[in-house]
């Protein structure tokens, strides 16, 4: 967003701005996760159950972050928490809250499984989180309790990522309506709107979302410019670097858990999933491993076909 002097805050060339420093230090990790997430999103867009698992995982991630934001805003105790609370109040708006938005998406995505709000809430409260996801959630709470200022790492990396990619993801989802349960009374437009709240920051349209993004970036910079020590800024940057690794790991964990489950069932869904993993994955080692698995799967299919052909032939004879 531009101010009255027609200058963007922070300026892209402002090497002292905390946001720019985070971006510079995490540039390689950012490129790596972008490529990885692009592959995984392409696969998830073809399998609704995988997409739903990803949305569920990030519900818990953002819920953990926003629990800490609420605690720091409403009940700061230590001097460091009071300092962070003052900073948060300068840029945080309820429009940015994601956990309640993701919850709306989960109500739609799980509507065929949980017919009432109570049953969905019970599921969310008792769901056994995968190990790495649980570790990430624990790490969020531990980091912020130890160094309250590190909440600013999550505010920068995760929320700005949604601002940047939300519109693109909504567009892709519009072309993949098979991800959502069928509702006779909802049009395609209504279905996408009800299932993409996670990626939507305003119902007023893209212009308002762009304004909110620049407002967020501007106020984040103004709030952190002089309120933090250099040591605190370095700690925020360090935690920001780790967030990319955690994102990579929890998404990879979803893929690995699905691969194990589908291989155990050996179904058409298993074959299509493995094929798409092989098609979209550019990592040579991963491609070789998946190629080996695909050959094994095809060999098993060939043996089955041969078995039934021989059995049919012998029954005729």
Swiss-Prot record:
Transmembrane segment boundaries: 290-310
Keyword Magnesium: no
Residue intervals on the Cytoplasmic side: 1-289
Cofactor(s) essential for the protein: heme
Gene Ontology BP terms: heme catabolic process; heme oxidation; intracellular iron ion homeostasis; response to oxidative stress
Compartmental location: Endoplasmic reticulum membrane
Induction field: By iron deprivation.
Domain of life from the UniProt record: Eukaryota
Signal peptide: none
Cofactor: binding comment: Binds 1 heme group.
A Gene Ontology molecular function term of the record: metal ion binding
UniProt KW keywords: Endoplasmic reticulum, Heme, Iron, Membrane, Metal-binding, Transmembrane, Transmembrane helix
InterPro entries: Haem_Oase, Haem_Oase-like, Haem_Oase-like_multi-hlx
Record GO cellular component, one term: nuclear outer membrane
Entry membrane topology: Single-pass type IV membrane protein
PANTHER family documented for this protein: HEME OXYGENASE
Described function: Plays an important role in the degradation of heme under conditions of iron deprivation.
Protein's recorded name: Heme-binding protein HMX1
Organism name: Saccharomyces cerevisiae (strain ATCC 204508 / S288c)
